[in-house]
Amino acid sequence: MSPANTKAFLELHIEQGPVLVARDLPAAIPTVIRGNVRFPYARCLGEYAHSAAVPRGGRKDALLATVELVARLDALWQELEAEGHPDTVFTVGKLYTDAAEHAMTKVPGACCFTLNFGGTSKDVLDRLRDRTYALADEIRAARNVTFALGDCVGSDPTPLDDGLRDRLRTASQALGIPVIEMPTVGHDASIFARAGIPAAMVLVRNQHGSHNAAEAMEMADFGEGAKLLAVTALELAEQ
């Protein structure tokens, strides 16, 4: 597939978040797919010690150092929201000590974790990456530990095609389906858009988010989203 032989890519997907439920709307038209900055294999290394024998000043607690890093990044996330970047997100999906070594009476000597930032602004994502390195260095010096953040990977924010979004808006008005426009998370559409193929999406309202057993969707909402996609696809095919 290439721009030479592919007119457009249209994708239908559940929202995976709470916005459409809160707004009581069946569907949305995404404006941009969030980019991300990720540290998938980060570690903090300290020194294992007896919890009752080592005073605070003599500890090299890898877990407390990691928790401080996470807390300070969370504070930075709040600052960014206050500055007008509500589309920025921050998640620590993994944080754990070594099960073979950890104990209630042992100072943690190692902690593994992940950091995942998302957003619609490359400048903001770059700022988050740079600040992560700076904070890790500050905490390293203060707590006498070492951070090995590992590879930093990610992708830039990907705007979706304006012309296709216009068609979807027109279809929503013609069908009487109320929609909003909003950013979305990583989807197949971003791959096509980065390859130069016009891409757009329709998000369908769903209950209880995603990535959990309570995830749900009303078939009526699925039908509304499918109508938007079908009408737009047929118009493109007839050109």
Region spans (language model):
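Predominant activation on well-ordered alpha-helical scaffold segments within soluble catalytic domains
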Residues: P40-Y41, L63-D74, Y133, R169, ...
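Short amphipathic alpha-helices in soluble, non-transmembrane regions
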Residues: R127-A136
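Short catalytic/ligand-gating loop segments at beta-alpha or beta-beta junctions
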Residues: M1, H85-T88, C152, I180-V185
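A short beta-alpha structural unit
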Residues: V89-A100, T114-T120, T146-R165, S190
